[in-house]
Amino acid sequence: MSKYCCNIDHKRVVALGGGARTLVISAFFIPLFFLSSSEAYSEDGIKSNDRIYNRGGDIGDVTGIFNSNTSAEGGAAIYNTGKIGNITADFINNEAQARGGAIANGSAGVIGNITGDFIGNISSADGGAISNEGAISAIINSNFINNTVKNVDEYEFLQDDVYGGAIYTKKDLNIIADNGVSIFSGNKVDDDGVIVQNAIYADRGGIFSKEPVITLEAKNYGQIIFDDQIDGNAKGYQLHLKGDKTSEISFNNSIKNAHITLEETNVNVRDGVYISDNKSLDVKSGILNIANMNSTAINYEKFTVNGSININSVDVDLANNSMGHFSADEYGESNGNIDVKGVNLISDSHDSATKVLFADSSYADTVTYSGASHAYSTIYKYNVGYNPDDGFFTFVRSSGSMNPSDNFNPSVLTTPVSAQSGAYSTQMQTFNYAFQHADNFMSLPIFERIALKESGRYAMTGSAGIYSPLLTRIENAGYWVKPYVSFENIPLRNGPKVNTIAYGSLIGFDSSIKPVKYGFDRVLTGYIGYNGASQNYSGVDTYQNGGLLGGTVTLYRGNFFNAITLSAGASLGESHTMYGKDNFTMLLAGIGNKLGYNFEFKDGKYIIQPSMLMSYTFVNTFDYTNSAGVHIDSDPLHAIQLTPGVKFIMNTKNGWQPYVGINMVWNILNKNKVTANNVRLPEMSIKPYVQYGLGVQKRIKDKFLAFGQAMVSNGGRNGVSLSFGIRWFIGK
């Protein structure tokens, strides 16, 4: 900073600007004078990095910026054994080779209020920013950032250990946030390379000295935030947390060796372990909010609650019958409230029902449980309850539901759910749509099919009034494409109700019709496909994307047809659970056979076509470990499906071919063994269901055939499946 104006007297010191000198104020000398390595007092005033050395003197307020001062003694910016008024200043990058990187207040020192920011100060003894052995009225709306106390080898004669990354005190200390913010962050103790994030260390002056009292007061919407620990002498010290209901004091690091008292204000503790290593806890009033308590007890010499403690989550170790809780050698009279808002199960019980102690009988009736009625371990689901009469939580694994999947964490059910409602359902869609040539060709009357095979044209029938479109090339080879999508919910047997969307597209090529032995005609079809699916159940979202290859052989003889298809593919799955993202791979294959017969009426204007589809599906989900660390081991799924059905087809004069279809679907042998950490999961399957719907196809000129279908499912699958497509013919 450039030149400034200042006043210097016994009542006030204003220090602004830049320089490198020492102002010495002594009760034993009459004059005031400056000392530095090369100059005495001059009239140009005090500059911003001038050092104040008050040896028993009495001065007023200090205002300024103390930047980059160094001192071989304590207090690189201010050393005080006398009296100083209020200090309003920032202390930046000052370094002392003894106590107090910025300020050293000796045992006889008295300082008023301190307001300012302490950033990057360093000391080689106690107190990276402030060392206090005297009296400081209060530190108000001040931030302590990245201050360090460091035990340097060349200064080991000073002391063996160093304390107080930001502040070291042997006397009472008041830290206040009054409609402002005080942050302690990045402060540390570096003791021969052992680094501890520490903000304040409270020490005792001697054998007969009393416990120092550290008071943190937040008021008028003030906030005090500690990212670094508060520690003190093992004999203990007092830590008073006070303020009003508009303000907060937050701890993101530990408090150690303190007798903690809370009054009126709101105190936030990120983890219960941060307040576990202390002498006592007395919540007189106000609210103590604890984000999480681990599964071990917090033991105090004395524990009293007359305010409120809110615990967002408590870890429960069912395998060892323990959970986080407060215990003490002595319990004070408690009339407050401890509210547990949730539990986190970190292990599973050996039994279906487990009781775990949470509260001593002296305060058990002050505890309430306001969390969910159930909780999940990584594998199981438990019903949760609390008994205020004895202080025990109960965890019951049996949910009372007739559905065994209700006893499990949904995150471990991804494999059986995806195998059934994802991969298996996708394979069923393939079987439904792979018989494209038979679906198109067998919608024609027999005389037209014969005409196609023999002459490549339909014969005109004169005035008979029989449907006879011209110049169709369905007997020729052709390409086809058939996209599809379905929107369904699937109430799996022994499993959850799954909302699923399946989508994909098949692209195929049909050969021309060729005669073979025994009066049959044959068509060969090859196809490739993309398939995708998504499932949602019990808060779990799962997605699969994959592809397949397949081939179909279709045989025709008169009004009879038989088609057999074989396909294989793979799919990559991604599941999002309460623990994160899981990835898995699925291999699927299958064979299906569809046969049917046409019963024609009125020269083929109306056709009734009963059919039977039989299929076998193989789905293998490769073993994987999910994001909760549970190993999922799956045996392959082997499934057989039987689908009898009937179609009612109408051939119109203008070339439209509408139809109505109905199918009954049975799934048999469609269960697979899946384990989670060797725990057998429910074997799920799709219940029988009925499909019904309508479709239409239309020949367009001489080159194309367009078709579409909508089918509704009820029973084991509920929803709608939509498909449409086009076939175009090649050749003359």
Regions found by a protein language model. Give the residues of each.
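Solvent-exposed, glycine/polar-rich loop segments of beta-barrel outer-membrane systems
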Residues: 493-500, 538-542, 572-585, 620-638, ...
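Outer membrane beta-barrel transmembrane domains
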Residues: 631-732
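Residues on the lipid-exposed face of transmembrane beta-strands in outer-membrane beta-barrel proteins
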Residues: 505-511, 549-555, 566-568, 591-599, ...
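Extracellular beta-strand/loop-rich repeat segments of large surface/secreted proteins
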Residues: 217, 237-355
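Outer-envelope beta-barrel architecture signal
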Residues: 475-479, 518-524, 558-564, 604-610, ...
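Extracellular, surface-exposed repeat/solenoid domains
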Residues: 2-5, 299-405, 414
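Outer membrane beta-barrel translocator domains of Type V secretion systems
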Residues: 420-603, 709-711, 716
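Extracellular beta-strand/beta-solenoid scaffold signature
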Residues: 40-55, 63, 68-80, 95-106, ...
